[in-house]
């Protein structure tokens, strides 16, 4: 088994990439065969997440999925989660919350930490909760795509994740923005309506703004704060 402790780049499996959908299903099938219940999907319920959930359900209909509930998300995001639960009732969808409430965080670190120290806010409300959710897991799935941003251009299907000392599985690395939307429309999948209002990438409400450029689909995240990642995908 490929784990963080036994990682050997020469042992990584290869997958067909002539068809993105089949390729993603091959990656997911390998991952669930390889890790079974030791595999977790950390989903933001953005448009890539909607695609991955549909693909995962074809491979493992009772897969474990975690949403990092920072208590700062848009109402539309929570509504999307409820619709997904109804559409895929066997999936085990869990909302992982931070140990600090927003009031406790403000008391300890000051008001609007997402403005004064966004990295600390992401650490408290995303990174630490994901560590807790991944306790005992050997691998996790992410919806990263190479096209999303310059920091993601070298992501592979199977990655050594030094931050979480885990294996990170990324089935959608070769998918384009258009590929994602073609799949959504072809399968008539329900998605977050904020995508239709100029939000290609959706995170916490205070740190997410519309981004009307396909050149950088994440330009609406942490705008003006010199930050493009929450820290989950940084080594």
Curated annotation (Swiss-Prot):
Catalytically driven reaction(s): [thioredoxin]-disulfide + sulfite + AMP + 2 H(+) = adenosine 5'-phosphosulfate + [thioredoxin]-dithiol
Family the UniProt entry places it in: Belongs to the PAPS reductase family. CysH subfamily.
Residues annotated as the enzyme's active site: 230
GO cellular component: cytoplasm
Domain of life: Bacteria
NCBIfam families noted in UniProt: APS_reductase (TIGR02055), cysH (TIGR00434), PRK02090.1 (NF002537)
Function of the molecule: Catalyzes the formation of sulfite from adenosine 5'-phosphosulfate (APS) using thioredoxin as an electron donor.
Cofactors required: [4Fe-4S] cluster
BP GO annotations: cysteine biosynthetic process; hydrogen sulfide biosynthetic process; sulfate assimilation, phosphoadenylyl sulfate reduction by phosphoadenylyl-sulfate reductase (thioredoxin)
Location(s) in or outside the cell: Cytoplasm
Gene: cysH
InterPro entries listed in its UniProt record: APS_reductase, PAPS/APS_Rdtase, PAPS_reduct_dom, Rossmann-like_a/b/a_fold
Protein name: Adenosine 5'-phosphosulfate reductase
Annotated cofactor note: Binds 1 [4Fe-4S] cluster per subunit.
């Amino acid at each position: 088994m490929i784990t963080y402790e036994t990682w050997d780049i020469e042992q990584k499996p290869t997958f067909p990439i002539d068809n993105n959908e089949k390729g993603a299903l091959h990656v997911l099938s390998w991952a669930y065969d390889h890790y079974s219940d030791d595999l977790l999907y950390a989903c933001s319920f953005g448009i890539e997440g909607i695609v991955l959930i549909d693909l995962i359900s074809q491979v493992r209909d009772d897969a474990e999925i975690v949403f990092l509930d920072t208590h700062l998300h848009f109402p539309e995001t929570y509504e999307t989660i409820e619709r997904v639960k109804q559409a895929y009732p066997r999936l085990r969808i869990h909302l992982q919350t931070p140990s600090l409430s927003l009031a406790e965080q403000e008391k300890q670190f000051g008001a609007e930490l997402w403005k004064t120290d966004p990295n600390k806010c992401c650490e408290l409300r995303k990174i630490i909760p994901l560590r807790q959710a991944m306790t005992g897991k050997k691998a996790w799935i992410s919806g990263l795509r190479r096209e999303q941003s310059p920091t993601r251009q070298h992501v592979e299907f199977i990655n050594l994740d030094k931050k979480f000392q885990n294996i990170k599985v990324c089935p959608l690395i070769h998918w384009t923005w258009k590929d994602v939307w073609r799949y959504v429309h072809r399968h008539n999948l329900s998605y977050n309506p904020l995508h239709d209002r100029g939000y290609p990438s959706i995170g916490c409400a205070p740190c997410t703004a519309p981004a009307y450029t396909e050149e950088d689909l994440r330009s609406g995240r942490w705008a003006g704060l010199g930050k493009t990642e929450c820290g989950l995908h940084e080594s």
